[in-house]
Regions:
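Glycan-recognition and processing domains
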Residues: 33-100
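Solvent-exposed strand-to-loop "edge" motifs in beta-rich extracellular domains
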Residues: 111-117, 564
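Extracellular carbohydrate recognition and processing domains
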Residues: 129-161
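Short beta-strand-plus-loop segments that form exposed binding edges in beta-rich domains
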Residues: 166-175, 614-618
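Exposed low-complexity, polar/acidic, P/S/T/G-rich flexible segments that act as propeptides
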Residues: 172-190, 630-633
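Beta-strand-rich domain onsets/edges
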Residues: 183-196, 202-207
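C-terminal functional module detector
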Residues: 202-267, 273, 277-310, 483-725
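Catalytic cores of extracellular degradative/oxidative enzymes
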Residues: 260, 287, 311-489, 493, ...
Length: 725
């Protein structure tokens, strides 16, 4: 069974498990309340008092690496006379008066209802490493209640998990927790003396102060809590100063708790030797050094961050398509610092809507009034809405006002795309092409592509977010390109669901002065490439990425492509030339940090041509990769389609569109805040299916028009596109 089917089965089993306990246990009056505008389903519980536990809540995720997420609201029920929590993710905040910022073994006892509990993971806030410890527990059949006793190694309990929690239990198939006990060993070593560290962060080339990501670790790997001189960061409704850097950040230390500072930083720490790490995105080299902190002295360090590449000098400016934060005021230096510290020039901050609610609100001012800029780095408002598992998640850039559909028209995506298209500079597309999970033909990508299949033939889809979370998924994008639709690629981190801003990014070539208007205008022309490390250069007969080259049949096409990759991030593997979706040439990097490819093609017909580069890291869920937008070669006004593939692709996409009017809804088990939207989406799908018929008919007519035009280009496609010189 595939991983996606296993996961869906597990989630359905969880629902069944919770239904079973609900049928046999008594619901008690233990009111749960949500925490503000919280997209994680955080619900605090009025549970029985547990020693040294200040708060208990259910949530969608714990933010302790390795602890599973969930989508079922927690309940408190009586089981055999005991008050128990039924749920998937349960967070526990240890009373700070009992334990806070310690470093010692802690004994944890968890009592659960055996018959209703599936395998679960205990996660905790830990010193060193990723900042999280995990232990897996597999219940064995036995008594009505079982107590699992575990040792939480190097427990820190400094409130780094969701809503300041210290410990979380995650069980995708459900768990029934009936009591919990935390007992300290009191082995934390109290420092005998302290000193101070003062950091100055500069760009080595300009000498100016810059924000950066930082790590400071003692000889045990412990990261002292960041001081109030660091940036206050936002993760959902959490305000915190430290985060855990995942493996996709290429962070060079085995210790991955990091913080951010804007030019200067100062803190008080125990005396000793520390590892100091600093970074500023993929165009900069890592700084690594050791510093000594002595008693009652200040250790001053100036970090001159060295560039590996200077993309703005060549007119290329990076952006992140997909950042979620709540912004109350347009001017937000803390948030700006978070984005600028990763050297992202354009951070698109997206309000996020669903059929019931809107999260991550942006200021009332939109359009140009929503832009905040400092030192050539911008943050600007946009939106991710509408969002459904049936049609996909959509992103809209550079908009003059938000366009959130009402519940009774939420599946009428075309209304948003048409409204944004009518706004000066508005750009619309689809997110998350890298998602995996349940959906059409066992792959949610099929469902996510349904919205694109409906709107692309109407000329409403400007881009697809093909790179996210270490995955570049190009199948749907290539299909649209092979129909002649000039859809651009984008890359977005989806912070705080996935990566820090800028871990994946897309570069835009700007001719002339850089500002947001010129950046969005150049992106709209397709002058872009997506990457999480490799940097690309690509021309055909002097035309660059995203440009159109009109030639006569038989014209020689001189392809010149190059890629480079900072070896501190990964080892460059190869560069590929892609013609109409097929790899036409490959050049190995042969152990070097840069590679060039030269190829001669013959323009026998129109085509789209792109390049992509790979690093050595090629895990399916974590690949080092870059991909350019195409250069479009036009011969005799023929569309840049893959002529022989057009009928098959049209039949596939046309079928998906036509089934919209008859298929039942397939609401994903996770995503889209399913705990608050599932029933509404199911009801509204039935009501709104008939309303989609005009759009379905328009898309069908557009596909037929494409086939009619295709028939006029009757000459067979050549077997090859050229030869290597």
């Amino acid at each position: 069974m595939s991983q996606s089917r296993l996961w869906k089965y597990a989630m359905r089993a969880s629902l069944a498990s919770i239904a079973a306990i609900a049928a046999t246990a008594t619901l008690i009056d233990a009111t749960a309340w949500s925490h503000g505008n919280e997209a994680r389903m955080v619900e605090f519980l009025n549970w029985k008092k547990m020693p040294n536990i200040a708060r208990v809540f259910g949530a969608n995720r714990a933010h302790l690496e390795g602890t599973p997420s969930g989508s079922v609201r927690p309940q408190i029920r009586m089981v055999e006379g005991q008050s128990c929590i039924v749920g998937q993710v349960i967070g526990f905040d240890v009373d700070d008066r009992y334990a806070f910022d310690i470093d010692e073994p802690v004994e944890l006892s968890v009592t659960y209802a055996t018959a209703y509990t599936s395998p679960f993971v205990i996660g905790w806030d830990k010193s060193g490493g990723s900042g999280a410890g995990v232990i897996e527990i597999t219940p064995a059949p036995g008594e009505t209640f079982t107590t699992a006793k575990v040792t939480l190694d190097r427990a820190r309990l400094a409130g780094q998990a969701t809503q300041g929690a210290d410990i979380a239990i995650g069980a995708p198939n459900g768990i029934v927790v009936c009591s919990i006990e935390v007992v300290r060993s009191n082995k934390t070593i109290v420092p005998e003396a302290y000193g101070r560290v003062k950091l100055t962060l500069r760009d080595a080339k300009t000498g100016g102060l810059v924000p950066a990501r930082l790590g400071l670790y003692d000889k045990t790997g412990r990261a002292p809590l960041a001081s109030d001189k660091s940036l206050m960061l936002q993760r959902f409704a959490d305000d915190l100063r430290m985060l855990a850097a995942n493996e996709r950040t290429f962070w060079p230390s085995e210790n991955r708790q990091v913080f951010y500072a804007d030019g200067n930083y100062e803190t008080r720490v125990p005396v000793g030797t520390y590892e100091l790490v600093a970074s500023r995105g993929i165009e900069y080299k890592f700084h690594r050094s050791q510093i000594e902190v002595t008693k009652d002295k200040t250790t001053e360090v100036t970090i001159d961050l060295q560039r590996y590449a200077d993309m703005p000098a060549a007119g290329w400016y990076s952006g992140d398509a997909h950042i979620h934060v709540t912004r109350d005021e347009v001017a937000d230096p803390q948030l700006w610092g978070f984005v600028s510290a990763e050297d992202v020039h354009v951070g698109n901050l997206l309000e996020m809507g669903n059929v019931q609610n809107v999260y991550f609100h942006q200021p009332k001012a939109w359009g140009k009034a929503s832009r905040f800029e400092r030192d050539g780095h911008f943050i600007v408002s946009g939106q991710e809405s509408p969002r459904t598992g049936q049609f996909g998640h959509t992103i809209h850039f550079n908009i003059q006002r938000p366009v959130h559909l009402k519940t009774d028209e939420y599946f009428l995506y075309h209304k948003v795309f048409q409204e944004v298209a009518s706004q000066p500079g508005g750009i619309s597309g689809f997110a998350h092409m890298g998602w995996r999970g349940a959906g059409e033909q066992g792959n949610r990508t099929g469902q996510m592509n349904r919205g694109m299949a409906l709107l692309a033939p109407l000329g409403l889809v400007d881009f697809i977010e093909v790179l996210q979370g270490g995955r570049l998924v190009n199948e749907g994008w290539y299909r649209l390109l092979n129909l002649g639709y000039r859809v651009k690629p984008a890359a977005g981190t989806d912070w705080p669901y996935s990566d820090f801003p800028g871990v994946v990014r897309f570069y835009v070539k700007v001719d002339g002065p850089f500002n947001l208007d010129s950046w969005f205008a150049s992106y709209d022309k397709g002058r872009t490439f997506v990457t999480n490390g490799p940097l690309l250069d690509f021309t055909i007969n002097g035309k660059g990425i995203g440009e159109e080259l009109r030639v006569k049949r038989g014209t020689r096409l001189d392809v010149a492509a190059a890629a480079r990759l900072n070896p501190q991030l990964d080892k460059l593997d190869r560069l590929e030339l892609v013609v109409l979706g097929d790899v036409d040439a490959t050049q190995s990097a042969d152990g070097k940090e840069s590679v060039s490819l030269r190829k001669e093609l013959t323009a026998e017909h129109s085509m789209w041509v792109a390049v992509r580069a790979f690093g050595a890291r090629q895990d399916p869920r974590n690949t080092t990769i870059a991909h350019s937008a195409p250069i479009y070669v036009v011969v005799d006004d023929e569309p840049t389609w893959k002529r022989e593939a057009v009928p098959e692709i049209v039949a596939e996409l046309r079928g998906r569109v036509q089934r919209i009017l008859t298929d039942p809804i397939d609401t994903p088990i996770s995503g889209n805040e399913v705990w608050e939207t599932r029933l509404t989406l199911q009801d509204q799908w039935l009501l709104q299916q008939p309303l989609l018929k005009p759009t379905v008919d328009a898309a069908d007519a557009a596909y037929q028009k494409l086939l009619d035009r295709h028939a006029r280009f009757a000459a067979p496609a050549p077997a090859t596109v050229g030869s290597t010189r």
